[in-house]
Amino acid sequence: YGDTSGYSYDLGPNGYNAAFATGGYPYTSPVGYFAPNGYGLYDMAGNVWEWCWDRYDAYPNSVGSPYEGGTDPRGPTSNLFIEHVTRGDWWSDSANHARCAYRNSLNPDLANYSIGFRCVRML
């Protein structure tokens, strides 16, 4: 479980371990509706975009990035309206964005049925 396709963490043998347009559920699905992935984790892709604390910017090692050299652009800056990263895709989209390597950006003022969040804790 783990390859270079970018999809290995949620697409099981039947390809439908994520809630997206071709995943067999016509709208947001209940928590745990789909089988867990190979790591035993549920609902890691699809259903709703999930807000991340990281602000959106070029990847840290991208040429021309203000964070070139490896500094991760985490958390808000003095401008709280800067776009933040969202990940995971949402139920009405295709599987192209339902992969761990894809990230999206949205303004924190935006709120609708396609956006959610996941509570996490550092161990």
Language model segments and positions:
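Surface-exposed recognition segments
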Residues: 4-5, 9, 13-29, 44-123
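Short, small/polar residue-rich loop motifs at catalytic or cofactor-binding pockets
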Residues: 34-37
